[in-house]
Amino acid sequence: MQFTIFTHLTMALSYAVPILIAVAFLTLVERKVLSYMQARKGPNIVGPFGLLQPVADGVKLFIKEPVRPTTSSPILFIATPILALLLAITIWIPLPLPFSLTDLNLGLLFLLSMSSLAVYSILWSGWASNSKYALIGALRAVAQTISYEVTLAIILLSVIMLSGNYTLNTLATTQEPLYLIFSTWPLAMMWYISTLAETNRAPFDLTEGESELVSGFNVEYAAGPFALFFLAEYANIMLMNTLTAILFLNPSSLNLPSELFPLILATKTLLLSSGFLWVRASYPRFRYDQLMHLLWKNFLPLTLALCLWHTSLPISYAGIPPHL
């Protein structure tokens, strides 16, 4: 019994720790990319080429005294950052890298439901702070996240229609002859832009305007709890880019040795994440009405039409005689 518990704990840790290490170094990559795009050097003091900067930042944040507003809800104020990071790590469970921790039959639905639950951590953190600025920021963030989840769900449904299964492992078999990005490129473009909005990245970073005096829902957070929110945000960025690679650029595990699969997937994830950083360095922030107009007036009708199109394709092909 004890051995079984130890094995399960080791498996969970071996899954979570590499994600957290990757997240830590993604922050360094972001700072380096932004600095070079602004013609400056970026972090280069702590360690060789600044490689130990994420470690120094983490140590500094976690040894600081966590300041809590006197009027806040104490339990919920501390619980929400923990919940945010827990959900950000848990959502990786069904991803085939090339083997998933748990091969779920409804893996894509699990991803959708877990990403929807992440909204509660934002809402509760804004409410628990007992600050009107934090609450307004949280409500704005929740509205943005829920809105763009509609598009993501419809795009996922279209991909499911083409792959014929809710499991993520099937996508490797589906994309063996051709990547789905070639046959569904309008969906892939809208998916990528929607993931930018879903993860609250520039130019959709209305949730957490770092250049503003009041940054958003996490304005009252400092030290350790703030670091947990930060880790959760970057873990979600890594997750969304890994999911994009699996959905539209999946290297087929049937033709590759299992050792090469994670390397190729990680390379594609890094390139997609670099796109996120490039966009942040290049584009100004959207106005809130433009953000909502883009989704409800542009993306939603397009994704609904394409979903109907992709639903009709398998039915149409099933009616074609085999000799044609």
UniProtKB/Swiss-Prot annotation:
GO terms for molecular function: NADH dehydrogenase (ubiquinone) activity. GO terms for biological process: aerobic respiration. It is found in: Mitochondrion inner membrane. It catalyses: a ubiquinone + NADH + 5 H(+)(in) = a ubiquinol + NAD(+) + 4 H(+)(out). Pfam families: NADHdh (PF00146). It is a multi-pass membrane protein. Its EC number is 7.1.1.2. InterPro entries: NADH_UbQ_OxRdtase_su1/FPO, NADH_UbQ_OxRdtase_su1_CS. GO terms for cellular component: mitochondrial inner membrane. The chain crosses the membrane at residues 9-29, 75-95, 106-126, 142-162, 177-197, 228-248, 259-279, 300-320. Keywords: Electron transport, Membrane, Mitochondrion, Mitochondrion inner membrane, NAD, Respiratory chain, Translocase, Transmembrane, Transmembrane helix, Transport, Ubiquinone. It comes from the Eukaryota. Core subunit of the mitochondrial membrane respiratory chain NADH dehydrogenase (Complex I) that is believed to belong to the minimal assembly required for catalysis. Complex I functions in the transfer of electrons from NADH to the respiratory chain. The immediate electron acceptor for the enzyme is believed to be ubiquinone. Belongs to the complex I subunit 1 family. PANTHER family: NADH DEHYDROGENASE SUBUNIT 1, NADH-UBIQUINONE OXIDOREDUCTASE CHAIN 1. This is NADH-ubiquinone oxidoreductase chain 1.
